[in-house]
Regions:
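Conserved N-terminal catalytic/coupling substructures associated with nucleotide/phosphate chemistry
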Residues: 1-131
């Protein structure tokens, strides 16, 4: 739990993206997945809302949780393994974790940097999109 708060204390950046995702996997996740894979790698947190008007990073992020973590994880795996959505799956089992914070479940996805031999990572069968 403390690790998530430490991560959030620095705010969103090139290696951290937060998404509300209370009811499911947002389509914007895949743009972030490919961007992280093609650069430095990074962490995507589902179930966390960023309040852009808040300057204080300790108050800027709100843990809202996801409604059905198991379903979201299943959907994530199904989609990342679909060549129609993303050209390569870089994730291993340990890269997707469900974390309980104050009774709310968030999902942390660690996207590794893609090896140069498999870059660019792209989405929707479109080399010019999501790279």
């Amino acid at each position: 739990m403390q690790d998530i708060y430490d991560l959030l204390s620095e705010g969103e950046r090139v290696t951290l993206e937060c998404k509300k995702a209370t009811k499911g996997v947002p389509n914007s996740l895949w743009d972030t997945y490919s961007a992280f894979a093609n650069t430095y790698g990074g962490t995507i947190l589902l179930g966390v809302v960023e309040h852009m008007d808040e300057q204080n990073n300790t108050k800027r992020f709100e843990i809202v949780g996801v409604e059905d973590a198991d379903k979201i994880r299943k959907d994530l795996w199904n989609t990342v393994n679909s060549r129609e959505k993303v050209n390569i799956n870089l994730l291993y089992d340990d890269d997707i974790q469900t974390i309980d914070i104050d009774g709310k479940k968030i999902i942390a996805i660690n996207v590794p940097r893609a090896d140069y031999t498999v870059r660019p990572v792209y989405i929707n069968n479109n080399l010019s999109r999501g790279t």
